[in-house]
Amino acid sequence: MDELTAQALRDFTTRYCDAWHEKHHSWPLSEELYGVPSPCIISTTSDAVYWQPQPFVGEQNLAAVERAFDIVLQPAIQTFYTTQFAGDMHAQFAEHTLTLLQTWSEDDFRRVQENLIGHLVTQKRLKLSPTLFIATLENELDVISLCNLSGEVCKETLGTRNRQVLAPSLAEFLKQLNPLL
């Protein structure tokens, strides 16, 4: 496990939950995750769930993704998706408004791995270097991803070579995020 990334993720999650508490006097609320089982759910309303992060349960690796492509993934991406279960969190990085993706449950973790495999299949077909997404942006063709070769975090336009380095590492990227409610 990449402890720097794990700590940076936990720290951002704490900042996010603290900001939510300060503004709403509750744990984060999600309508999108209503009806989706998770150990994070602490209460339910008629159309939303209140959640709090929980420790990740299960194998702490993305072995299915590695096996599918016979590659070794950056330790930071393994840590990012296996440190905790949590809801997706909105954030600001410099001028970028984003949604930081998280795994919500063990079932969601399997879905995330399938989506990462699909992303890598497309990149391989287009002869692009491998990246693994960690956040979405307002423009659905752009994502924030981790370059599996360099470990840098970049903004990329899906299906193209357009990439802009945002941070030298995932830990540094997470440290610079500001919660957005």
Curated annotation (Swiss-Prot):
Keywords on record: Cell inner membrane, Cell membrane, Membrane
Pfam families per UniProt: Syd
Gene3D superfamilies reported for this sequence: Syd protein (3.40.1580.20)
Species the sequence originates in: Escherichia fergusonii (strain ATCC 35469 / DSM 13698 / CCUG 18766 / IAM 14443 / JCM 21226 / LMG 7866 / NBRC 102419 / NCTC 12128 / CDC 0568-73)
Name of the molecule in the record: Protein Syd
Principal cellular location given in the protein's record: membrane
InterPro entries xref list: Syd (IPR009948), Syd_sf (IPR038228)
Protein task: Interacts with the SecY protein in vivo. May bind preferentially to an uncomplexed state of SecY, thus functioning either as a chelating agent for excess SecY in the cell or as a regulatory factor that negatively controls the translocase function.
